Amino acid sequence: MTRRQGGFTLIEVLVALVLMAAGLALAFAMLRSSTAVAARGEDMAQASERMRAVHGYLRARLTSAQPIVFATDRGTLRQARFIGTPQRMRFVTDLPDYLGHGGPYLHDVVADGEGRLLVGFSVAQPEASLDDLEQRAAAQRPERLVDGLRAVRFHYRGLDADNRLGPWQDRWETSEMLPLQVKVEVEAVRGGRWPDLVVTLTRSEGGAGGGLLPGGSNPVLP
């Protein structure tokens, strides 16, 4: 009986086993790689969807913000229609239909320092003091818009003395009026920094949406 008639030699069997093991290892490596790529793709898709949802909500609420008084400073009698700080903004806008019966409500949007962006809702009460406002906010159970954030900052701007868009500010000092624009900066723990969201408030006293400034002059936008 020849060698070929007697079957494979031990060396040939070992070589075949080594090649088979290498092939299986390569197949498993490719499977793990494709699974990791698919998981990363799914994570990116979820992060993108979350970003679009949050941006869409904030854009809709800010665009329709109304110059309705929701608090009055008892000392100066200044009426608040928009209060904005780096991590918080309060304004009146319509409540989404899916959250209730609609209509104008005070919205309290806040980055809570724990990686969450929250929003609280309450009935606007023009006679309420600023202290009343804080007490009501402390008693609220706000809704969570999104979590897993590293940083959130709000910026505001209106028209300058030359009737042009002024610089971005970390605080909106003219609480009696709506800002002309609001910018939202967000950096997520996973996914990095989101594109900046810039929203024009169409009912701003700054003249957005074709309105006129007091005295009849039109704003000059760049």
Predicted feature descriptions by range:
Residues M30, T35-A128:
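Extracytoplasmic beta-strand-rich oligomerization domains located immediately C-terminal to a leader/signal peptide
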Residues G102, G192-W194:
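A cross-taxa feature marking solvent-exposed loop/turn segments within ectodomains of secreted
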Residues I83-T85, E176-L178, G191:
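Solvent-exposed loop and beta-edge segments used for protein-protein assembly and interaction
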Residues T2-S34:
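N-terminal single-pass transmembrane signal-anchor helix
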Residues D97-L180, G207-G209, P219-P222:
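Intrinsically disordered, low-complexity regions enriched in Pro/Ser/Thr/Gly and acidic residues
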Residues E187-V189:
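Beta-strand-rich extracellular modules
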Residues W194, V198-P222:
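Extracytoplasmic/luminal low-complexity segments enriched in Pro/Gly and acidic/polar residues
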